């Protein structure tokens, strides 16, 4: 049965995505549990990770309001896209994420202007990145045709 699925590219891709989703869910299970029970996202309250949520919210608000790249409210004024490029502003996943958030904001009235929204968004995006990483890694290792190394 597995061989039958494996020989058809669409079914193989579906199986790889399904396995990647399951593995990612197992990987992020403890983080989801901590978030649900304690309200902690990935680590603690003083983590640098918490800096990224306001940065994401700031970028989202500027991109959706179609403001220019220079903003006087960013520190002493500056190019926020260049300054936040290391974090998010040039990531293709960020653009897709912001597009989906904007669509959800317009259709089902989610509130991305509240900082608590971005904690949930961080968990979802971390899960999505993990699934994508598993899929790309599988295809990369298949392309490289790695053979098992002898133990001794």
What are these regions (language model features)?
Residues 1-34:
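Start-transfer (signal-anchor) and selected internal transmembrane alpha helices
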Residues 10-11, 113-117, 144-148:
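Membrane-interfacial loop-to-helix junctions in multi-pass inner-membrane proteins
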Residues 18, 127, 134, 149-151:
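Hydrophobic transmembrane helix bundles of membrane-integrated enzymes that assemble
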Residues 24-134:
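Membrane-interface coil-to-helix junctions
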Residues 137-152:
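Transmembrane-helix signature of polytopic, membrane-embedded enzymes
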């Amino acid at each position: 049965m597995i061989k039958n699925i494996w020989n058809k590219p669409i079914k193989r891709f579906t199986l790889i995505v399904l396995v990647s989703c399951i593995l990612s869910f197992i990987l992020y299970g403890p983080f989801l549990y901590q978030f649900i029970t304690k309200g902690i996202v990935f680590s603690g309250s003083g983590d640098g990770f918490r800096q990224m949520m306001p940065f994401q919210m700031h970028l989202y608000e500027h991109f959706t309001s179609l403001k220019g790249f220079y903003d006087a409210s960013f520190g002493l004024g500056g190019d926020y896209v260049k300054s936040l490029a290391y974090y998010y502003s040039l990531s293709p996943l960020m653009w897709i994420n912001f597009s989906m958030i904007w669509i959800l904001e317009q259709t089902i009235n989610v509130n991305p202007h509240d900082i608590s929204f971005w904690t949930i968004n961080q968990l979802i995006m971390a899960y999505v990145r993990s699934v994508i990483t598993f899929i790309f890694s599988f295809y990369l290792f298949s392309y490289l045709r790695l053979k098992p190394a002898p133990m001794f």
